[in-house]
Structure formats: C-alpha cells, structure tokens
Design a protein with these regions (language model features):
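Bacterial N-terminal signal peptides
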Residues: 6-16
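N-terminal pro-sequences and low-complexity stem/linker regions of secreted or lumenal proteins
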Residues: 21-358
C-alpha cells in the first residue's frame, strides 16, 4: 500500500469514528420576545395528560408541544421553584420560610434543628438578574399576594382560612424569586412580585415583561387546602384537578388574546408543574439520586405553547427545570448559564424542538 493512500485511508476511518462518537449538534433556540411560565402543583404526568381529568391541559398538549419526559428535581415544592430560576436547589429540601436558617425558632422553620440545614435565603444570581443585565424585564405574578413586594410567608382569605398554613391561599414556598437575597434586599426587585390584579392590568394594557412566572393560589394550582371552611373543590383530588385545569385554560386564553401574541415576535407559554405526586424520585439531567436535595422530583407534565412554533409535537427528550432555565437563557440571549443549566455533560440540553419557529 502506498504511503499517501494509507494515510488517506487512516484519515477516513478516523473521521468516520469521530462522526459516530460526536453527539448530535443541537440547533440554537430562536430568540424570544416573551416567555411566560405557569406553574401548577404536585401532579404526575399520567394524572394530567388525560382528557377526562384535565381537558384543557391535555388539549394544549395535543395541539402544541408536549415534553413527554420532563421531571422535577426534588420533593417537596420550594426547591423546584428555586431550581427553575437559579439552576440549583442550593441544599433546600423542605418548604420552610425563605429567611430560615439553622437553629431558627420561627414556626415556619420547622426543620431548622436538623443536621445539614441550609440557609433558605439564596446568595446566588437568578434569571431575573440575567435579564436585567441584558436590558430585558421580568415579573412574578402570584395570586393572593397581599401587596406588590410583600415579603410574607403566607396570606389567607378569612372566608376560608383558620389562620394556618393549610388554609393559606398564597404561599411563598411557591414563588422561587423570594428566596433570593437580591430580591429580599432590593425593594425595586421585590416590587416585581405582584398579585393577579396586576396581571389583569398588564394583560389589558399590553405592558408585558420579557419573562413572567405565573403561579395561581393553592386552590387554583392543584395543591389544595385542608380546613373546615375550605370549599370542597379546593380539597377533593379530582375536583382540584378540574379547577386547576380550568385556571390554566383561562390564563392561556387571556395571554393569547394580547397583541403581543398576535405579533411577529416569538412568544411562548410554558405550563409546567413543580413536582410529581407522592414520593416518586424519578429524575434526569444533573440530578444526584442519593443527594438529599437534588434527587429527582418525579415525572411531571410540561407543555410548550408558542405563537409561531410547532403544532402537535411530542418530544421524548429527557428534560427538567434546569433544561427549561437553559432554554430561556438561550432564547433571551443572556450571558452565562446558571448552576446546573450549564451541565450539558450531565444531560441538561435546551428544549429546542419545542421552541423552534415554523
């Protein structure tokens, strides 16, 4: 065999092996003008992707984009919201108050005497800060938050509440943003956390932020309440799913009625859940099964609804809230990737197929 021919053959073989070993190139997520994330609570994929149980959400999944293998990071709720915004659970694995520290005697810090208890105020950047640095805007809309920027653990309606956490309509454990020190310490950032009265006004006026986190109250997000004055549809499982499904359907319709949705700019509404029901530890993508706070929060529904994107798409790629964060960072063209959103070597990839533009 001639030397030149042998070298060429070796090069061809090497190239063939390299092409087989290289992972597929994932296309860049298109630039988005608006991404609104609606979060519901504590339901498994199979409970919701059933037209008989949740016709609105199941219908949206069939019509738009369905992430069929999407997972939470942990149980219970609080750390999943933090993970969505900051790329990590930061050691949180309970629903204690956002100011709780080890040894704190506050009733909202029930686990503070446990070994390894972490500061629930997170001293790390969040998605809102990335957006600010890029000249973009953000807001959190939380139903029954008593006032813009209110740094409270719970808020109740006297008509149904007995003053306990189990009857509170608003719960800070379902906000995420309030855990970050930069929100707690800066009134200008805290005032970006508002109630649904402001959501109504912003949708009517067309003054929409680049990113919005939208969380209904505990009757409307499928979490549920327990108490003598709590309506049956807020505590009975099937009725609770129907109520939350109706809330999601209404929110999506109202967002789709805005001029921004009908414009040339790209707009996405993501309907997701914080965690699955029960104690399922199913997870993916930079989770650590034996970790106390990042072990996987179960298989959950996640629907991506876009004004110019795919229709009738079921995407079986494994994703979680870190994947969604990475996708939003790319869609908004912000600098850097927060926490586990950077862990492509651990399976955290963008949700490109669900955000592509037709």
């Amino acid at each position: 065999m001639r030397p030149m021919f042998a070298l060429a053959l070796v090069a061809l073989v090497a190239a063939a092996f390299a092409s087989q070993a290289a992972p597929p190139v994932r296309r860049l997520v298109p630039r988005y003008a608006h991404i609104f994330v609606i979060v519901e609570e504590n339901k498994d994929y199979g409970q919701i992707l059933d037209p008989a149980a949740a016709p609105n959400i199941a219908g949206l999944a069939a019509k738009y984009g369905n992430a069929t293998q999407f997972f939470g990071e942990v149980h219970p709720s609080e750390a999943n919201y933090v993970a969505l915004l900051g790329g990590d659970t930061f050691g949180i694995h309970d629903d204690d108050g956002f100011t709780c520290k080890a040894g704190d005697a506050d009733p909202f810090c029930g686990g503070s005497s446990e070994p390894g208890y972490v500061d629930h105020t997170v001293h790390a950047p969040h998605l809102g800060m990335q957006l600010e640095a890029a000249g973009l805007t953000w807001k959190g809309y939380f139903e029954n938050l008593p006032a813009p920027g209110a740094l409270v653990f719970i808020a109740s309606d006297p008509a149904i509440s007995d003053g306990t956490r189990k009857t509170a309509l608003y719960a800070s454990k379902h906000t995420g943003f309030v855990n970050f020190a930069q929100v707690q310490a800066d009134p200008r950032r805290a005032e970006k956390l508002v109630g649904f009265d402001r959501l109504d006004r912003d949708l009517a006026d067309g003054r929409l932020p680049s990113f919005a986190l939208i969380v209904p109250n505990q009757c409307n997000e499928m979490h549920g309440l327990v108490g003598p004055k709590v309506p049956a549809e807020c505590s009975h499982k099937d009725a609770l799913i129907r109520r939350g499904d109706q809330e999601v359907g209404d929110l999506v319709k109202r967002i789709q009625a805005t001029p921004a949705w009908r414009s040339a700019g790209n707009f996405a509404i993501v309907v997701t859940f914080d965690e699955g029901a029960g104690g399922s530890r199913g997870g993916c993508c930079a989770v650590t099964p034996d970790a106390p706070s990042n072990f996987g929060g179960g298989h959950i529904p996640t629907i991506v609804i876009t004004n110019h994107g795919p229709r009738g798409l079921a995407d079986p790629t494994p994703y979680n809230h870190y994947s969604l964060l990475r996708t939003m960072e790319e869609a908004f063209r912000v600098k850097g990737r927060l926490g586990h959103a950077a862990d492509t070597d651990k399976g955290v990839v963008t949700m490109t197929p669900l955000f592509e533009v037709r």
